[in-house]
Amino acid sequence: MKNKSRIYLIASAFLILSVSSYSMHIMEGYLPVKWAVFWFILCAPFWIYGLVKLQKEAKGNVEEKLTLALAGAFIFVLSALKIPSVTGSSSHPTGVGLSAILFGPFITSILGTIALIFQAVLLAHGGLTTLGANAFSMAVAGPLVSYGIYRLLKKKNKSLAVFLAASLGNLSTYVITSFQLALANPSADGGITASFVKFAMIFAVTQIPLAVIEGLLTNVVMNLLEKYNIKQGVKA
């Protein structure tokens, strides 16, 4: 019962913090139709398999369900934070590393997409037409990187594995976002490559420090969960 209360309090705190948060995603109507559809198609297999795995996970005990809620709240709040950059753009954490470590990339693709839908509908962050692109970068690519890094390094140094999984999962999201923006807006001089470099450099100024912070914060949350034996291991 104490463990359940702790999870509930942590999740509630994250949700309360989200009230005054803001975010940066690819905005509504920004992508040409062909690219908007393309990213939806790429996300579809992850969503389908993710729903199957989420249904199985939801049949677990109350503690498992509360941990799912915590992972979802962590994604929603961190991805809703807005940090202005020196270039006039903005960056934010993603929060997907924690869920990828606890539940694997497929369930995380669902949790991340749900967070993006709520942000688009309730907070006017991102958009529904660009949901596929935003979901692929934050809810698919990021979790895959986080999951792979954690699985690769967890037996050598678990704390380092968590840190790198969350940090590099964050950075990979912005590498993909830069690529998505470059595909939709190739530079007149240099094409997609030049455009990608431009967007990546804009994001890097604030995103690298944010990735480090997210890695540290994810480690703190993981240590709390493991301290109370709330959830162990990773589920693919």
From Swiss-Prot:
Entry annotated with the keyword Transport: yes
An individual GO BP term: cobalamin biosynthetic process
Pathway as given in its UniProt record: Cofactor biosynthesis; adenosylcobalamin biosynthesis
Record-annotated membrane-spanning stretches: 32-52, 66-86, 98-118, 120-140, 159-179, 196-216
Signal peptide from the UniProt entry: 1-23
Keyword terms: Cell inner membrane, Cell membrane, Cobalamin biosynthesis, Cobalt, Cobalt transport, Ion transport, Membrane, Signal, Transmembrane, Transmembrane helix, Transport
UniProt keyword annotation of Transmembrane present: yes
GO molecular function annotations of the record: cobalt ion transmembrane transporter activity
Cellular-component GO terms for this entry: ATP-binding cassette (ABC) transporter complex
Subcellular location: Cell inner membrane
Bilayer topology term: Multi-pass membrane protein
Pfam (any one): CbiM
Biological role: Part of the energy-coupling factor (ECF) transporter complex CbiMNOQ involved in cobalt import.
Sequence similarity: Belongs to the CbiM family.
PANTHER family: COBALT TRANSPORT PROTEIN CBIM, PTHR43627
Quaternary assembly: Forms an energy-coupling factor (ECF) transporter complex composed of an ATP-binding protein (A component, CbiO), a transmembrane protein (T component, CbiQ) and 2 possible substrate-capture proteins (S components, CbiM and CbiN) of unknown stoichimetry.
Protein's recorded name: Cobalt transport protein CbiM
Organism: Sebaldella termitidis (strain ATCC 33386 / NCTC 11300)
Gene name of this polypeptide: cbiM
